[in-house]
Amino acid sequence: MKFQSTLLLAAAAGSALAVPHGPGHKKRASVFEWFGSNESGAEFGTNIPGVWGTDYIFPDPSAISTLIDKGMNFFRVQFMMERLLPDSMTGSYDEEYLANLTTVIKAVTDGGAHALVDPHNYGRYNGEIISSTSDFQTFWENLAGQYKDNDLVMFDTNNEYHDMDQDLVLNLNQAAINGIRAAGATSQYIFVEGNSWTGAWTWVDVNDNMKNLTDPEDKIVYEMHQYLDSDGSGTSETCVSETIGKERVTEATQWLKDNKKVGFIGEYAGGSNDVCRSAVSGMLEYMANNTDVWKGASWWAAGPWWGDYIFSMEPPDGTAYTGMLDILEAYL
């Protein structure tokens, strides 16, 4: 999400197998290929490298299992590059951090769901814009090599590039694609993100050059994010209107069609209120009517430290888990 509030949260929340009940939408066969939630926690905290369990946390496999049981088949798993690679992007791994990340990914894929590996770094490393496409390609060749034999793993080049040279964003995404394929990861999809926080509502104006990306395996997915508050930052539980969800993805939908691409909403959310429920439902229904270009969507976000966060999808009592999941269930 645009506002990096995840870095400041440290309220603990448990997990269980309880599920919410509420006024439901009619269940139907899923029209999306992938539909699920983000799994946040390993990117929390401002201390680098920080202490596991104090500054950051890894997602709870039992909570992931609960969401899989509800029908989710996709989880975007956040991590911080500086914790995985404390010395340099091309350096050695912190083995404990890598092992914990792999445990989460394995929990997802062992449950038959897809895991999207998400370096949640905003196009930056140690606070500086990533400028070396060579180093970025090596980073991705090394990381993809860890998971190249798991067909249920997918790769997200980086979270929410912003305030960067547009050609650099294009070239970093291409370097990531090249590195992933060089690792021998040829079966997995690669999710590319754009500049300006990869917003769907600004995509056409900002990220048109992204259509020039190439992949020898033809498995590029254009990941966009879309929040429904006034500034699109995802910091308010108030949605602009009941129709704002559909409105904010309409132009991007046409861009995907015009350029013969496929897309995915990697982050979206709205408050647990009537206006947002209608706005979220309207966006998803519009996407469901355009599945020739939309592969699916993932809610922001589940994770064990969200506490009473306005968009928490963490079982058993996250605000969105109890207040919004019935809206999403129509698409699971």
From Swiss-Prot:
Residues 1-18 form the signal peptide. Keywords: Carbohydrate metabolism, Cellulose degradation, Glycoprotein, Glycosidase, Hydrolase, Polysaccharide degradation, Secreted, Signal. Its EC number is 3.2.1.4. One of its GO terms (biological process) is cellulose catabolic process. It comes from the Eukaryota. The active site is at 160 (proton donor), 267 (nucleophile). Belongs to the glycosyl hydrolase 5 (cellulase A) family. This is Probable endo-beta-1,4-glucanase B.
